[in-house]
């Protein structure tokens, strides 16, 4: 008899309630009445044959009385139970209710309530179980009864706190239920799944064959392939569950099973992505992008079928064009050969921790390999100390890891270079991060890497690829299993208690303030992120009395889709994590108009857009209506101006800043012009650029502001020096966004300029004092966001003179900042704005001309490259023959031709010294170096070049003697 038939035979046509059952119904109705959130419709007679009615659950009756979900229930009363070590055992003698839910006669989730001693006053106790997919799969429907074990977590006490906790768990059940409802609930036989895979793979292979003959149609063919991927993923999920010993497998069960192993989580992620696409057709050019991502999943499915079912599928997958150039192919073929020829036996991992920055799969002769860029974790982490490793295994975690690797030689361009091949890796979250997460919950822990609970937790995260956020949102049965596995045999469970508290109070289903911040922290567990979330002396306010979390996290709590978490750029750069946090496609769809405008502003630099590009009136109105008073006050709503739409805060701050700047251009001072001309005549400066001389002549004559635009090397700092000398007796304030930039300003100023103060912009904007200086210099203006600039201008008096410098093509601000871009075209008063265009970092006129053409987006750039050069040559061994002061520019920091890897090639080309090793890095005498910060000394400034002339080892350190060409004596 099949499982389906076993289930059906339990579904009853008639039931009889005992006196205990009727007492249980009555008592349960009296308890479940938490302020209108649960509306019961129970029956104590034989009204329904397989269940005892239902209740409507209202998530937040203060906002809406509309039920969020109905729950079907069975209510049993009993005196027959046993209790041992806090666990209550009860025998459910009829399986009609679980069978009724398993058969899915109802679309609503089911809950079994068991009331102990229902007719004994003050002795009643309520326990409950959700009829989840995994709970039902554990029931043997060939039998007539089931022993159910209730833990203390399953008890509902007659207190407000316990009822509130029950309601939060109902929210969690609803979230899981809504996603599972998108999945197919019908069982699929193993043979049927095999047939689906064979059919879909034959279709995909035909598409790839067509594409191989006509590669220009890659996007069009990719659309057809993407359309067929849902069934392929579905069938593979089913086969994976059968392989792991499950029977009667549905898509719902198969999806849950795929989450529990690191080597099958790709199926879970694949399905989530396909369900997000659903029946929509990707826009032009986007299917191609999806296929480049899904290519790796298809390779995984092919391997899965070959290893587990001895089936050959997608044999022509390698014919799908991945657009690798010749140098890429040559390099990756050599890497693959080295990986295949070395011993990959697992080794002990090294001490250093890394974050995975980027994973790039590549394919050679039908085999898949990975190029993995790792970022050193910790306070000394920079983009300059990333490490590239190669592997046949991927790394499946957001968290910091420790690695073991083998070095092997690879020759390219006549240079033998060591590459790192991964032997093993493990999750290794810095214990201080666990302690800081505990601190956020007002708990004090001192976990270190020697704690057995830490060791067990890291092993679990490594084996499963799961993250802590997923863990605390698992269904109760699964969470209990994992918790017992990790913490069941340890002497301590300090962090286990933290996880239980977070699961109880701040899971997805929670309505408490702080859940988004804590959820994001759990997803990433990085010290630099966690530190910003804590209150400090500048921002001591907390978001809640129950959390040690900064009040600056409040916008992110309100709406993480549109507000950045403090210190990050989550709303723009980490949409994936935010979508995982919310797990609600309706919320994502609701904020789509805002996100569309935000993206368009970032892409185009424009501020106003046609409404038709954003959405219908109804879509925009729905978004605006969803905002509360606080969000509207902060300007998150969308406004319309003459048929064009934009985001209110972006528009208002832009207009306010530009109005203030224009007000400062209405001052005329003829005396100032005379003073300027006198300075130019007597200063003794030999002007190398006539533009600077003209700027000084008209400085502050018609305006109280001076905007200086120009790329690096055009002399912005030189002009600021001239202005500082001109106002020698005035009180001067120099402001920058970062400490590094401020040190650069201090270093570049003439030492004989007096009356100078230097500050970080944030220290001014968060102080209660106004700026009292005569002239204010603001550097790197393109990195200052609108809100900060609006606050800063409010601190500066109308009488002060302001010099603002920057490059609009430079690094953008973390938050929205377009004011400096628009000011270039708005501020037109004579002498109020200058763009420096002459570069002083090359003497080659041809290169200067090309540089100017590129900056101006000239239509003849291609012609100049062809006729005026050569400006470039093919990458090869000539790159290692450097002139004395030559610098090689790399387009990025990562991968085979990124800055870090190219530095290693240059080092290996240095044959004048042996290598001195220190942790994962090697150094040679004669290596050229560059200082990237002023942490060691303000004299060793950012971008100062030097050469290593001696290296020696001390007991616990390495010592470098470095030759630099700089004045190291402070006046």
What residue spans do the PLM features occupy?
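ASCE P-loop NTPase helicase motor core
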Residues: 697-864
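Conserved helicase C-terminal RecA-like lobe
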Residues: 930-971
């Amino acid at each position: 008899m099949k499982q389906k038939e076993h289930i059906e035979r339990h579904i009853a046509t008639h039931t009889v309630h005992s006196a205990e059952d009727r007492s249980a119904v009555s008592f349960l109705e009296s308890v479940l009445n938490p302020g209108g959130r649960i509306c019961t419709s129970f029956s104590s007679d034989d009204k329904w044959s397989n269940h005892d009615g239902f209740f409507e659950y209202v998530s937040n009756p203060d906002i809406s009385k509309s039920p969020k979900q109905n729950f079907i229930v069975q209510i049993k009363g009993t005196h027959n139970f046993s209790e041992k070590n806090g666990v209550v055992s009860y025998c459910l003698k009829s399986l009609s209710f679980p069978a009724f839910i398993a058969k899915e006669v109802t679309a609503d989730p089911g809950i079994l309530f068991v009331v102990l001693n229902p007719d004994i006053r003050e002795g009643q106790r309520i326990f409950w179980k959700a009829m989840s997919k995994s709970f039902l799969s554990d029931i043997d429907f060939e039998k007539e009864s089931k022993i159910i074990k209730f833990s203390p977590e399953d008890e509902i006490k007659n207190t407000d706190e316990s009822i509130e906790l029950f309601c939060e768990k109902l929210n969690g059940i609803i979230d899981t239920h809504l996603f599972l409802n998108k999945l197919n609930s019908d069982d699929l036989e193993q043979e049927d799944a095999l047939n689906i895979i064979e059919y879909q793979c034959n279709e995909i292979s035909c598409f790839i064959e067509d594409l191989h003959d006509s590669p220009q149609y890659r996007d069009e063919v990719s659309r057809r392939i993407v359309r067929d991927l849902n069934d392929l993923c579905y069938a593979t999920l089913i086969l994976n569950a059968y392989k792991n010993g499950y029977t009667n497998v549905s898509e719902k069960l198969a999806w849950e099973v795929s989450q529990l192993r690191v080597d099958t989580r790709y199926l879970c992620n694949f399905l989530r992505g396909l369900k997000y696409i659903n029946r929509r057709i990707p826009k032009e050019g986007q299917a191609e992008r999806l296929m480049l991502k899904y290519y790796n999943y298809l390779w995984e499915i092919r391997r899965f079928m070959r290893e587990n079912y001895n089936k050959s599928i997608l044999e022509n997958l390698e014919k799908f064009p991945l657009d690798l150039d010749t140098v890429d192919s040559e390099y990756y073929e050599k890497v693959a050969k080295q990986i295949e020829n070395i011993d990959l036996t697992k080794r002990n991992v090294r001490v250093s921790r890394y974050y995975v920055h980027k994973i790039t799969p590549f394919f050679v002769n039908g085999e898949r390999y990975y190029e993995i860029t790792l970022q050193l974790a910790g306070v000394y982490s920079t983009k300059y100390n990333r490490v590239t490793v190669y592997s046949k295994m991927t790394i499946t975690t957001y968290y910091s890891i420790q690695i073991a690797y083998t070095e092997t030689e690879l020759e390219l361009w006549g240079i033998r270079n060591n590459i790192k091949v991964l032997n093993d890796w493990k999750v290794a979250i810095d214990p201080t991060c666990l302690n800081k997460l505990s601190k956020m919950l007002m708990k004090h822990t001192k976990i270190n890497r020697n704690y057995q609970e830490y060791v067990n937790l890291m092993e679990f995260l490594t084996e499963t690829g799961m993250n802590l956020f997923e863990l605390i949102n698992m269904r109760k049965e699964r969470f209990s299993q994992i918790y017992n596995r990790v913490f069941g045999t340890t002497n301590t469970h300090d962090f286990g208690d933290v996880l239980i508290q977070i699961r109880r109070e701040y899971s997805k289903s929670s309505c408490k303030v702080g859940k988004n911040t804590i959820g994001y922290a759990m997803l990433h567990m990085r010290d630099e992120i966690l530190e910003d979330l804590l209150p400090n002396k500048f921002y001591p306010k907390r978001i809640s009395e129950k959390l040690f979390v900064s009040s600056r996290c409040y916008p992110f709590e309100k709406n993480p889709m549109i507000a950045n978490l403090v210190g990050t750029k989550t709303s723009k750069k980490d949409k994936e994590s935010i979508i995982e946090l919310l797990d609600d496609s309706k919320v994502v769809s609701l904020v789509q108009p805002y996100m569309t405008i935000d993206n368009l502003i970032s892409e185009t630099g424009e501020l106003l857009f046609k409404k038709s590009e954003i959405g219908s009136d109804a879509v925009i109105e729905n978004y605006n209506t969803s905002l509360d008073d606080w969000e509207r006050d902060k300007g998150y709503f969308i406004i319309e101006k003459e048929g064009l739409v934009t985001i209110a805060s972006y528009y208002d701050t832009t207009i306010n800043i530009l109005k203030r700047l224009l007000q400062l251009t209405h001052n005329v001072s003829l005396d100032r012009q005379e003073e300027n001309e006198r300075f130019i005549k007597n200063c003794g400066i030999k002007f190398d650029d006539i533009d600077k001389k003209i700027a000084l002549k008209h400085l502050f004559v018609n305006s109280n502001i001076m905007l200086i635009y120009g790329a690096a090397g055009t002399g912005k700092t030189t002009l600021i020096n001239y202005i500082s000398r001109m106002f020698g007796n005035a009180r001067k304030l120099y402001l920058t966004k970062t400490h590094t930039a401020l040190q650069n300003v201090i270093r570049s100023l003439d030492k004989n300029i007096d009356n100078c103060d230097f500050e970080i912009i944030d220290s001014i904007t968060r102080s209660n004092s106004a700026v009292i200086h005569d002239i204010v210099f603001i550097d790197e203006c393109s990195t200052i966001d609108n809100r900060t600039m609006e606050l800063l201008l409010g601190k500066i008096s109308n009488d002060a003179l302001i010099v603002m410098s920057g490059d609009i093509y430079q690094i953008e601000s973390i938050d929205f900042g377009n004011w400096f871009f628009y000011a270039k075209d708005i501020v037109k008063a004579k002498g109020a704005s200058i763009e420096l265009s002459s570069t002083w970092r090359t003497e080659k006129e041809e290169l200067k001309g090309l540089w100017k053409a590129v900056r101006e987006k000239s239509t003849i750039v291609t012609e100049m490259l062809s006729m005026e050069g050569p400006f470039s040559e093919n990458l090869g061994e000539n790159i290692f023959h450097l002139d004395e002061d030559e610098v090689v520019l790399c387009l990025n920091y990562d991968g085979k031709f990124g800055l870090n890897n190219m530095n290693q090639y240059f080092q290996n080309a240095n044959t004048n010294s042996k290598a001195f090793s220190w942790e994962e890095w090697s150094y040679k005498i004669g290596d050229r170096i560059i200082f990237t910060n002023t942490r060691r000394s303000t004299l060793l400034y950012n971008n100062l070049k030097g050469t290593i002339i001696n290296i020696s080892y001390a007991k616990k350190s390495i010592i470098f003697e470095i030759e630099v060409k700089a004045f190291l004596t402070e006046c």
